[in-house]
Amino acid sequence: MKLTALSVDGFKNLKGVSLIPDPSYNLILGENAQGKTNLLEAIWTLTGCRSFRGTRERDYLPFSGGNLQVEAKFQDARREQSVRLCMVSGTVPEKKIWCNDIPQKSSALFSVFHCVTFTPEDLSLVEGGPERRRTFLDLCSAQLHAPMLGLVRRYQLALQQRNAVLKQRLPEAQAAGLLEIWDRQLEQLGTEIAVQRGIYVRRLAEVCVPLYAQIARGRETVSLHYQSSVFGEDAQDTLPEMRTPELVQQYGEKMRQSRSSDLLLGHTASGAHRDDLLLAIDGKPAKEFGSQGQKKSLALALKLAQAEIYSKRRKESPVVLLDDVMGELDEARQAVVSTIVQEMQVFVTTCHPESLLSPKNGKRFLLKDGMLTGDVENRPETA
């Protein structure tokens, strides 16, 4: 998958940005706060997903007021496609999307255009809480299994309804009928989510473990385990091998066993919303015992594995967005990144191009005050 044309106007501080990207390597230069990350974020919006920076959609609108528009053409494995996103400012901003000139919802974009990002915030994959890793697993799974995001949304809605019943603190006999309605939905949805996570963690471990060994130059080993609050630790080994009806029954039994304690707590204490991806370095939890360098290497290995898995399973590469991270890596780690993404289209932002191992070919774009300045130049290493 390659972006062949991009036009951005009114996205935060970006004004009239129009470029023809290189099919391989694109270096986005500029001082801090000039719009480099905003440009990557504008590309990311074309996936239909929430911002990788956690930005609210209304905050995409230009700082000075007005409307925004992001337009792109891209080539996938079959054909060239186009996508256009417009947002009109107002008390409630109005967003419109067209894919190949046909009006669409944001959710439709996810199955059309795919990116993999690596940003400084991705260190939270290792240092953050379980929710961050669950979100990562669900997004990665959805890139290969399109219904996944819908499953997660429906699960969350059913969970909210079950928790609303629990918060009423009704006697168990009175609450049982209401809870049974939501338990039935949660056991079906939760099982499907857990199975997809288990399948993905198995694939992730197969790719991430050797990648980390490359990045760490064999100094230590990493291990990944899918911990399910219903199906136990190492669920990536057991879930894909079991029949779905048996798993649904097991999930339902867990829900009914915890009903009394859930009523006392006022919330649902077990289920897919309590799962985690356990990350260990030399057998010890990476979050507690890993050094900053080890955590950064592990986060990098996870994101590179995501890109490699997507490429192998989908038979085409995602667009890769590297936001202000390459300059922080030593030459050995940069070389690993370059090897993994060499067949992919990459956008790299930096303030310090001299710190990068840049390929001989590619394009360089200079951003200042939200606008492209000067001519686009080849050979990014000459900056």
Identify the role of each PLM range:
Residues S124-L125, E131-E180, R184-E187:
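Long, charged N-terminal accessory/stalk domains
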